[in-house]
From Swiss-Prot:
Membrane topology annotation: Multi-pass membrane protein
Name assigned to this protein: Glucans biosynthesis glucosyltransferase H
GN (gene name): opgH
Transmembrane annotation, as ranges: 142-162, 196-216, 515-535, 572-592, 606-626, 682-702
Keyword Transit peptide applies: no
Pathway connected to this protein: Glycan metabolism; osmoregulated periplasmic glucan (OPG) biosynthesis
UniProt source species: Pseudomonas entomophila (strain L48)
Pfam families: Glycos_transf_2
GO molecular function: hexosyltransferase activity
Taxonomic classification: Bacteria, Pseudomonadati, Pseudomonadota, Gammaproteobacteria, Pseudomonadales
Length: 855
């Protein structure tokens, strides 16, 4: 629609949202149409009236801040002469080709037998001989011996506890010729008992692995004599070579924008304070598909660049073609800019790292040319709910033992957790691109948990993967409540189950095959434990309801009594308790030895440990049920999504807790009732399980409260060193988060369409810079017409994304919304500003300014 037929509207409302001088505003107020206004702003006639708003993007963006952007050389033009912001470096493409997976051993054997070769692979290097490789192999054989030996002894004790002592009294020849029901009655107790024994062995071996890992970590940290730790190989604070350029990349997707950019700014300023800023570039790699959040990201990027003087160092890229999730996001970065950097540090959306930590990682890479990945041990901090503070305390107190223990057993063939780690770019690009898993179904397609796979591929290519467990200055945040943690666990569960398909892929190192196995067991142990408990209940029912057979052979003189050995039961129970809880006690002993002041003192840290143990006992059965559901959902192909409602202060509403935990509560009540009916004395053994399920709703809600978390901190309970003496990076993150929330941009897409400056920023940062081809123009016209017709509330997500990515369509929509006075858009924009208590105090309806009608 042309401006000549547009509805009259006030220019002053539009001009009020541009930071103009009184003289500029008075001059522009004489315009008679919005097309004329944009041409005056652009100081040149537009090629056509439809392009007037596009021509004024530059002046609308730079008014009041032109010198700042020009000094940083941030302004440029695209191939069509449209203004754009230099939000990313020039693209210098590098070839990134993922190797197709061949997960089927039989197919590989058949191809070899028939003389067909597999697809050529990138050349791999042999990891040079080193003493640590021999030591690591010996240590892992010792660990395997300890685990198997301990499990065999425990299994022997468990066999002695169970009432039916083996299959020796079952005559297999007889059961073949007797009626089926008699066979079932005779075999059922022994089958149950054997199944219980097998499950017990698997679960006990899993617990044993954790125990020996924590024990060796305790000894490593207590003595401090780890001669193989990677952090001891650097010469100290030597200058970083100019060619050792490092990219800090932060992949994000629909994240909390104020917190993301607060952590990024704190990290950036810490690197600047270290004096090594010229060796680092920062990239925010967005996969966000929520247009409101995407616009908020754009504004936050501009703000952090202005406030931290980060123009030319902090870059932003939002993908329009979102494939392969996070691994695809990183692939895209490597393909565009990876060849320009020697190293890459991957950050999570909640990561914060100190400049000294980052500089140390680069120095360690330089000092260890055979290292492909060096993973730090991030410290959890920054959350205030009771649940989060309990988890922060647990990871801060017990976590170092397990991290140091992992390093002890794995050395240079270790874990990579996907963030807060440095990666050598060249081998990563050549060997760690991830192809989709072949086939169909829930365990095919894009790899979800990319980190373990990338570490395995890096080691397969001949590069070491290390954990710098003692390197300070690496931080992360934990979920604020149980349900948010379980939401994350569902994705991790599906990803780890998918990764197990790579267990037999050719060339994988045995350690990383074990990593795939432990990743599966992290979640598969839950249904195994649940099945163990169900079978134990079934065995109880069998002993209670079925008439025992004391004489099972013809002419048997003496009855065969079920056996019970309480001394073995007590010994096995005590051993299991030691394996489960001794690592926690050792952690506190280590704190006593090293100094407990930062944890609130010896008494407080001990009391905190006891309370955390009680809390973990309450939560373990709840997690067991949820993880069992997640495993079943993955095998059944259910989508791994869980849309939780918005919550105030990250707390869990009672309604959501009832919906999520209600079935568990009913299960706990029914289970307890059944056991009480069968054998009330057995209920005492099952009480920790069913009691936790019954109490899951109030525990989930109460633990999510910030007030209780802060009260515990006031009492020095669950205190961690980062709360006792907060590092400057975390102080800065907290400060910037509060500032960002105060000025947070809401209803971003509506503002990008209607607001003069927000529209200019969105147009300048848009990436779909197509030419004037007829099909493209037709599509643009269709999208603009649809947006004007249905308004912001009726516009679907794909159309929103397409408009936000296209500077031409977005500027045309902006001009026509104002020219036609489209109330569907303008009223929502006004309401957004009215509802924003921290928006600039600009008049929406200026009364003292002349209201020229636009023809």
């Amino acid at each position: 629609m042309s401006n000549s037929s547009a509805r009259p509207e006030s220019l002053s409302e539009y001009l009020a949202h541009l930071p103009l001088s009184d003289e500029q505003r008075a001059e522009l107020a004489r315009c008679t149409s919005f097309s004329e206004l944009h041409q005056h702003l652009a100081a040149q006639p537009a090629a056509s009236t439809t392009e007037a708003a596009q021509a004024s993007v530059g002046p609308r963006l730079t008014v009041g801040s032109a010198a700042e952007l020009e000094e940083a050389e941030m302004l440029g033009v695209d191939a069509s002469g449209r203004l754009c912001l230099k939000i990313a470096p020039p693209i210098k493409r590098t070839k990134v080709v993922p190797e197709p997976w061949r997960t089927n051993v039989l197919i590989r054997m058949w191809r070899r037998m028939t003389g067909r070769t597999n697809a050529p692979q990138p050349p791999k290097r042999e990891l040079p001989p080193a003493r640590w490789r021999t030591v690591g192999s010996i240590r892992r054989y010792i660990l395997l011996t300890l685990m198997i030996g301990q499990t065999l002894v425990a299994g022997w004790y468990m066999k002695g506890i169970l009432p039916y002592q083996g299959w020796s009294f079952v005559d297999f020849d007889e059961i073949v010729h007797q009626p089926l029901w008699d066979t079932v009655v005779q075999v059922w107790p022994y089958a149950l008992q054997t199944s219980i024994l097998v499950l017990f062995g698997i679960l006990f071996c899993w617990v044993s692995a954790g125990f020996w890992t924590a024990l060796m970590g305790f000894l490593e940290l207590l003595t401090g004599r780890d001669k193989y730790k990677i952090s001891g190989s650097s010469a100290g604070n030597e200058p970083i070579a100019p060619e050792a350029r490092t990219a800090l990349v932060m992949p994000i997707c629909n994240e909390d924008v104020p917190r993301v950019f607060a952590g990024l700014r704190a990290t950036f300023e810490s690197v600047a304070a270290s004096g090594n800023l010229d060796r680092f570039d920062f990239f925010v790699l967005s996969d966000t598909n929520d247009t409101d959040i995407a616009v908020a990201e754009q504004q936050a990027w501009l703000d952090v660049c202005r406030e931290a003087k980060g123009f030319g160092r902090i870059f932003y890229r939002r993908r329009r073609r979102r494939v392969k999730r996070k691994s695809g996001n990183l692939d895209d970065f490597c393909r565009r800019w990876g060849g320009e950097y020697k190293y890459m540090v991957v950050l999570d959306a909640d990561s914060v790292m100190s400049g000294e930590c980052l500089s140390s990682l680069v120095r360690l890479m330089e000092a260890n040319p055979d290292a492909g990945i060096i993973q730090t041990g991030p410290k959890a901090s920054g959350m205030d709910t009771l649940y989060a503070r309990l988890q922060q305390f647990a990871t801060r107190v017990y976590g170092p033992l397990f991290t140091a223990g992992l390093h002890f057993w794995q050395l240079g063939e270790s874990h990579y957790w996907g963030h807060n780690a440095i990666i050598r770019m060249k081998p990563f690009i050549e060997h760690c691109a991830l192809a989709p898993l072949p086939g169909k179904g829930a365990f095919a397609g894009a790899i979800l948990s990319h980190d373990f796979v990338e570490a395995a591929l890096m080691r397969r290519a001949g590069w070491g993967v290390w954990i710098a467990y003692d390197l300070p200055g690496s931080y992360e945040e934990l979920p604020p409540n149980l349900l948010d943690e379980l939401k994350r666990d569902r994705r991790w569960c599906h990803g780890n189950l998918m990764n197990f398909r790579l267990f037999l892929v050719k060339g994988m190192h045995p350690v990383h095959r074990a990593v795939f196995l432990t990743g599966v067991m992290s979640y598969l142990s839950a249904p195994l434990w649940f099945l163990f408990l169900v079978l134990s209940t079934a065995l109880l029912a069998t002993n209670t309801l079925m008439e025992p057979q004391y004489f099972i052979e013809p002419f048997q003189l003496y009855p065969l009594w079920p056996q019970w050995h309480p001394e073995k039961a007590i010994a096995l129970f005590s051993t299991t308790i030691v394996l489960l809880f001794l690592p926690k006690l050792l952690s506190v002993i280590l704190i006593w030895a090293k100094g407990a002041t930062e944890f609130g003192g010896r008494v407080k840290v001990t009391l905190s440990m006891l309370l955390e143990m009680l809390f973990s006992m309450l939560l373990a059965p709840v997690r067991m049920i949820f993880h069992t559901r997640f495993v079943l959902a993955a095998f059944l192909g259910w989508a791994a999504t869980w849309n939780s409602p918005q919550r105030d202060d990250d707390s869990t509403p009672w309604s959501e807790a009832v919906r999520r935990h209600g079935p568990q509560t009913l299960l706990g009540i029914a289970w307890a009732s059944l056991v009480a009916w069968l054998n009330p004395s057995f209920l005492w053994w099952l009480a920790p399980i069913v009691g936790s399920l019954v109490l899951s709703i109030p525990v989930s809600v109460i633990s999510s409260r910030v007030r209780l978390g802060l009260a515990a901190r006031d009492e020095k309970l669950f205190l961690i060193p980062e709360e006792y003496a907060t590092p400057p990076e975390l102080l800065a993150t907290d400060q910037y988060t509060h500032e960002n929330r105060w000025h947070a941009l809401h209803d971003g897409f509506v503002r990008a369409v209607v607001d003069p400056r927000q529209n200019a920023l969105a147009c300048a940062m848009a990436t779909a810079r197509h030419g004037q081809a007829a099909p493209i123009e037709a599509l643009r016209a269709e999208r603009v017409a649809k947006a004007l017709e249905v308004g912001p509330k009726g516009l679907d997500g794909n159309t929103r994304l397409a408009l936000l990515s296209d500077p031409v369509a977005l500027s045309r929509l902006h001009e026509q919304v104002w020219a036609e006075h489209n109330t569907a858009w303008i009223d929502v924009w006004r309401a957004s500003i009215d509802n924003d208590p921290h928006s600039p105090l600009l008049p929406l309806h200026p009364e003292n300014v002349a209201q020229p009608a636009l023809a």
